[in-house]
Amino acid sequence: MNSQPLRVGIGGPVGSGKTALTLALCRALRERYNIAVVTNDIYTQEDAQFLVRNEALEPERIIGVETGGCPHTAIREDASINLEAVEQLNRRFPGLDLIIVESGGDNLSATFSPELSDLTLYVIDVSAGDKLPRKGGPGICKSDLLVINKVDLAPMVGASLEVMERDTLKMRGDKPFVFSNQKIGQGLDEIIAFIERQGMLTAA
């Protein structure tokens, strides 16, 4: 049991696969760790409901936050609504190992407040085109791990994974990234290994 839960922030544009990754992480880690999730949506609790429907965790371990307005404000400038959800989960489940905080769909400039997230994963998807990594922004350049998702779509949208890799290396330097396809679990083991290593997670 860890004294304070590791808080992992998952950000990225709308439709990049954040909720699918959150679901995959919950399914892979829930037997080994004491986990809870906070999701952010602007006007609904759709992502939270998706996770409940797909039985990611018990419903009481998932809190859906309705941010209203601009989604990245709730994870950065005024993270109070998310910090309160994290506290609520800590009270509800003493001894949590891991809390995943999934942001609402945001733009490339969104980042997590250090108060809210210990580690940040930023998810982009190949269907947005192979020029996306070179556009930069804090999510692409500064996240702890960049997840380039939906690699299976590359041939359909004419995107080059080689170009994406080259530009990602240029934009991120030695910061890690992983190619992923959550439909078949590609990249998931690497993402989990990164979270465990960097977050110093140890199973009970």
From Swiss-Prot:
UniProt keyword list: Chaperone, Cytoplasm, GTP-binding, Nickel insertion, Nucleotide-binding
MF terms (GO), sorted A to Z: GTP binding; GTPase activity; nickel cation binding
InterPro entries: CobW/HypB/UreG_nucleotide-bd (IPR003495), P-loop_NTPase (IPR027417), UreG (IPR004400)
Keyword Zinc (UniProt): no
A GO CC term attached to the entry: cytoplasm
Location, primary (coarse class): cytoplasm
CDD domains the UniProt entry points to: UreG (cd05540)
Protein task: Facilitates the functional incorporation of the urease nickel metallocenter. This process requires GTP hydrolysis, probably effectuated by UreG.
SUBUNIT field: Homodimer. UreD, UreF and UreG form a complex that acts as a GTP-hydrolysis-dependent molecular chaperone, activating the urease apoprotein by helping to assemble the nickel containing metallocenter of UreC. The UreE protein probably delivers the nickel.
Protein name: Urease accessory protein UreG
Organism field: Ectopseudomonas mendocina (strain ymp) (Pseudomonas mendocina)
Phylogenetic placement of the source organism: Bacteria, Pseudomonadati, Pseudomonadota, Gammaproteobacteria, Pseudomonadales
Gene responsible for this protein: ureG
